[in-house]
Curated annotation (Swiss-Prot):
Disulfide bridge partners, by residue number: none
Family note: Belongs to the BhsA/McbA family.
The organism of origin for this protein: Escherichia coli (strain K12)
GO cellular component, one term: periplasmic space
Localization terms from the record: Periplasm
UniProt superkingdom: Bacteria
Record protein name field: Uncharacterized protein RclB
Amino acid sequence: MFKKSVLFATLLSGVMAFSTNADDKIILKHISVSSVSASPTVLEDTIADIARKYNASSWKVTSMRIDNNSTATAVLYK
């Protein structure tokens, strides 16, 4: 029982530490990309190109829709 409690506490603290680190990032810009019949990889590559253009340290895709007019949104971080 003790081992399970320690394992659970360790996992929980790791999740809490990760979420704290993610919240510490400074938002640089919100972006949206779209393309006709694009694959997720194409949209993600476009987001990466925009992130490099703005010298973002990282980015996170916040939404993606793939159909005849594919779109994705992302947040760029300093």
